[in-house]
């Protein structure tokens, strides 16, 4: 009998709760929606926090990579570093440093690209990042096709990301050796470069896509790397009087 009474009491409680839900249906719906929005906002904030905190952790040597900054006499940081800084630091030969590298700010470029069918197609706003040859030692990009060693010895060498290579040439094709003709004059180009460009680059390697959460170009997708760029900032005559990129050091283990 006591069991039946407890069962009946529990049933009455459930009925009253159900009636209350029906009676205050609008308020309950608002409460449920509010709770759902709160959980969603918390989840988004947690994801963004983890995303930002994982910046640069995609790099093999992320714990040993140091971002080098310059400061004014008032201890205010400059925006970036000049392209000559990494060259000067290399000459000092710090025992604690394994390598220095310079990465120019990514900028959009326009190219006429030689396709597999020997045609030339125009591509605009391809985000190119000029780097020096030590970039591979510091950031260890995964080379999928071609050779970084060959690219480092080749003037005006282009290293495409996987997604751009697939977009232009398709899956399973080999774009190594294809030409890309610059279709504009850059601010750092020599005076002899026409306004319509004309400088020829060659594709020497394909690398895995660079993640968006890196110090190199936070939330900006990079389409290609440029090595030994005759039109770029590293060979620009006025490179010592301006900032235009980031300088990094790879510290020795320990």
Identify the role of each PLM range.
Residues 15-22:
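A short amphipathic helical element positioned immediately N-terminal to and/or at the very start
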Residues 75-84, 121-126, 153-156, 210-220, ...:
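Solvent-exposed, non-transmembrane alpha-helical starts
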Residues 45-112, 122, 229, 235-252:
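Membrane-proximal extracellular/periplasmic loop immediately following the first transmembrane helix
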Residues 1-10, 14:
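Single conserved hydrophobic/aromatic residue that forms the stacking wall/gate
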Residues 24-53, 63:
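Short, strongly hydrophobic transmembrane alpha-helices
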Residues 132-145, 158-254:
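Mid-to-C-terminal secondary-structure elements
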Residues 102-109, 113-154, 204-206, 221-224:
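The feature marks short, hydrophobic/small-residue-biased sequence motifs that occur predominantly
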């Amino acid at each position: 009998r006591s069991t039946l009474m407890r069962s009946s009491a529990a049933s009455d409680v459930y009925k009253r709760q159900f009636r209350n839900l029906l009676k205050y249906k609008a308020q309950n719906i608002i409460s449920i929606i509010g709770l759902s929005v709160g959980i969603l906002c918390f989840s988004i904030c947690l994801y963004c926090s983890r995303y930002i905190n994982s910046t640069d952790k995609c790099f093999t040597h992320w714990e040993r990579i140091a971002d080098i900054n310059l400061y004014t006499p008032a201890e205010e940081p400059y925006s970036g570093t000049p392209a000559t800084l990494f060259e000067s630091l290399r000459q000092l030969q710090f025992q604690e440093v394994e390598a220095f590298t310079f990465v120019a700010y990514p900028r959009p470029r326009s190219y006429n690209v030689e396709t597999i069918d020997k045609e030339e197609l125009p591509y605009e706003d391809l985000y190119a990042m000029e780097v020096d040859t030590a970039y591979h030692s510091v950031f260890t990009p995964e080379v999928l096709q071609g050779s970084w060693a060959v690219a480092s010895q080749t003037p005006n060498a282009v290293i495409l990301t996987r997604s751009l290579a697939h977009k232009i040439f398709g899956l399973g094709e080999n774009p190594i050796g294809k030409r890309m003709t610059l279709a504009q004059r850059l601010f750092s180009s020599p005076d002899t470069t026409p306004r319509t460009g004309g400088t020829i680059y060659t594709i020497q390697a394909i690398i895995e896509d660079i993640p968006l959460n890196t110090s190199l170009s936070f939330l900006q997708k990079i389409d290609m790397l440029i090595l030994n760029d005759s039109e770029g900032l590293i060979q620009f005559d006025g490179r010592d009087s301006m900032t235009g990129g980031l300088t990094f050091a790879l510290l020795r283990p320990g």
